[in-house]
Curated annotation (Swiss-Prot):
UniProt keyword list: Aminoacyl-tRNA synthetase, ATP-binding, Cytoplasm, Ligase, Nucleotide-binding, Protein biosynthesis
Keyword Cell membrane assigned: no
InterPro entries: aa-tRNA-synth_I_CS, Arg-tRNA-ligase, Arg-tRNA-synth_N, Arg-tRNA-synth_N_sf, ArgRS_core, DALR_anticod-bd, Rossmann-like_a/b/a_fold, tRNAsynth_Ia_anticodon-bd
HAMAP family: Arg_tRNA_synth
Major subcellular location class: cytoplasm
Recorded catalytic activity of this chain's protein: tRNA(Arg) + L-arginine + ATP = L-arginyl-tRNA(Arg) + AMP + diphosphate
Gene designation: argS
Protein name: Arginine--tRNA ligase
Amino acid sequence: MVRDRVIELFRKALAQGADDGRWPAAGAGFSVEAPRDPKHGDFAVNAAMVLAKQAGRPPRELAQAIVEAVRAADTAGDLAGLEIAGPGFINVRLSPDLWLRTLARAVAEGPDYGRTAVGQGKKVIVEYVSANPTGPMHVGHGRNAVVGDGVQGLLRWAGFDVTREYYVNDYGAQVQTLARSVHLRYQELHGRTVTMPPKSYPGEYVKDIAAGLKAEYGARFLDAPEAEWLTLFRDHAVQHVLGMIRGDLAAVNISFDRWSSEKALYESGTVDRFLRFLEEKDLVYVGKLPPPKSKKGQPPAQPQPDEEGVTAAEDLTLFRSSAYGDEVDRPVKKADGTPTYFCADIAYHWDKRQRADALVDVLGADHGGYVPRLEAAMEALGASRKDLHVVLIQMVSLMRGGESVKMSKRAGTLVSLREVVDEVGRDATRFIFLTRRSDAPLDFDVELAKRQTLDNPVFYVQYGHARLAAIFQKAREAGHAVPDFDLEAARTLASPEEQDLIRRIAAFPDMLAAAALAYEPHRVAFYLQETIAAFHSWYTQGKKSGEKVIGPDPVKTAARLFLCRALKQVLANGLAVLGVSAPDRMESPETRDIADDV
């Protein structure tokens, strides 16, 4: 990375200056950032401002001394200019040849170009999807899956040791409701008339589960008390649904390294051990929740059970989360002594933290209020809040013909993720889920996703990759060998459009590293769209001006072909990070072979 070269030169200069006694040894790190205005150079460095207080010198005066040291360190001539600006920033301009050599690096590193070591092998568990095993995955789950998979992919490219994890909620009330729904369908298959309660699961898959149980057990549980069949029906239903979920995930090419079970946390004694740990650390006590707030002018609100049946009137075992920044203390045990869902959840995070250096949770935006209590739990358990990062996923509106398609798992009319993938394809599904920030709502236009036109974002990027492949096909047909890097030839890449493409290629590793550290895979999709737009513009302009990639000048042709080679590699790598294919052949938007369009 060109940025790495700037960092290397400044570190060398600062170390030499410290050895010579010109300033103290550098303590805190300095930043090297691209300025907002390109007129200010390629990078801005704040080393003088960071070191000024320690050195006891004005920042601008120190900056001048650092500039002289950096110039002395730059024996290869990689820097074209160093200027002092503002309170003491050092603006850096790189030599044209240094930029050009990034093309050679992109081609030499091939499918590994863009990988960095910023993660230093740090172990990270990325937990995503974790949809309740009560039905097939809908489109909202799909966005969580694709964003989570994008996050873990970015972290791998940045040098982290990543474990992909799915947490199966196979213990609570919802899976019991599923089991009871299956039993009703089981009765129905034996000829009885049943009425499905409002909170049951009426989907066709419930009938399939019931049919499997009927085939295996006959009428054995038709009139049996619930205690005899509930656990069996629950476990059978959960395994059936998990099989469906695995299939849905496979349709978008997502798999996991570990499937963790809530039920297993209880059966292994992890939850009980965790509660004892909380008691030993004096992190819990018996008390009542604050009474519910009443509206102004209204009588005091009466305590109502929450989703776990807990009310403010009961004596509960409360976790001291308010001491760590949460709004109130949270119940970890109900009045009857059974653990709450929150208890199992923080026990799970306790378990994860013992297996990794950092945790990433990818959650629906409706869990936003849940984040502070998780952060409080992490801090109370002796970890840092920074060891947990939560990525929130906003809603998806599935659009068809300008109208929203509703999703309702309980009504049995959901539009499943599998249906969308079958209709628009894996690549379109994955890419479109990443065309907006995850914390912003997304309209998924099914008709647009199927369209083979340049207004379809995934088609637009893939078409650019295929166009580059077609350029090389045409070059071979014209007798041009795919060139190796030639610095003299590369110096002919002098147009503003060519220089822009070179800088975009050079920026690719830094972009990936920054996206990984921000947990934002949409940045890669944005980069690809912007970069391919710059390529299409350059290519079209060249055809109009007579400066085609394959032209009469063999030196310029060789340079432009090498630029295209590096760009094609970057596009392929960027698409690979997102789990999207990079085809070499496609039909053009006018339904002719793309080779006719170069």
